[in-house]
Amino acid sequence: MESPIRFENVDINTILKTLPHRFPFLLIDRVINIREDYSGIGIKNVTVNEPAFQGHFPERPVYPGVLMIEGMAQTAGVIGILSVTGTEKPRAVYFLTIDKCKFRKPVMPGDTVEYHLTRTGRRKTMWWFHGEAKVDGQIVAEADVGAMLAD
């Protein structure tokens, strides 16, 4: 008999214990629906107080697409670290690859971005994921990203 699929949710406190990233470069607020090292959804609440909006663009703030890609990578890092270590002890995680990146719609202050990550490959402590950034169910960006744990 197969064991039931277990979903996990982690809050900002667990993310802070898991990733080495800190303000202003911690770009996810929580990760929900983590299914082992296979999938999960990172959540980012975008506010007008984001440091990037000081220059991107003051008169019409648009959340930078590259920060959404980093949010996908951080979500992948949380999924990977928690699946391997099973603890909340920080380890270094590196952004390994980015492919097939597309930006489809602008993200504005007040939006909540969901980073939907699904594993497409794995080798030891390296993972590759397909990521879709969604706002209100619509894809605003997508990319294939890779992450690697380092000792």
UniProtKB/Swiss-Prot annotation:
- Which terms does the UniProt entry file under GO BP? fatty acid biosynthetic process; lipid A biosynthetic process
Subcellular location(s) per record: Cytoplasm
Mind telling me which InterPro entries this protein's record contains?
A: FabA_FabZ, FabZ, HotDog_dom_sf
Q: Does the keyword Nucleotidyltransferase apply?
A: no
Q: Which UniProt keywords apply?
A: Cytoplasm, Lipid A biosynthesis, Lipid biosynthesis, Lipid metabolism, Lyase
Q: Which reaction does it catalyse?
A: a (3R)-hydroxyacyl-[ACP] = a (2E)-enoyl-[ACP] + H2O
Q: In this UniProt entry, which cysteines form S-S bonds?
A: none
Domain of life per record: Bacteria
Instruction: Extract the GO molecular function terms from the UniProt entry.
Output: (3R)-hydroxyacyl-[acyl-carrier-protein] dehydratase activity
Which EC numbers does the record give? 4.2.1.59
GO CC terms: cytoplasm; membrane
The residues annotated as the active site are H56
The record's comment on protein family reads:
Belongs to the thioester dehydratase family. FabZ subfamily.
Job description of the protein: Involved in unsaturated fatty acids biosynthesis. Catalyzes the dehydration of short chain beta-hydroxyacyl-ACPs and long chain saturated and unsaturated beta-hydroxyacyl-ACPs.
Protein name, entry field: 3-hydroxyacyl-[acyl-carrier-protein] dehydratase FabZ
Protein species of origin: Rhodopseudomonas palustris (strain TIE-1)
Please name the gene that encodes this protein. Answer: fabZ
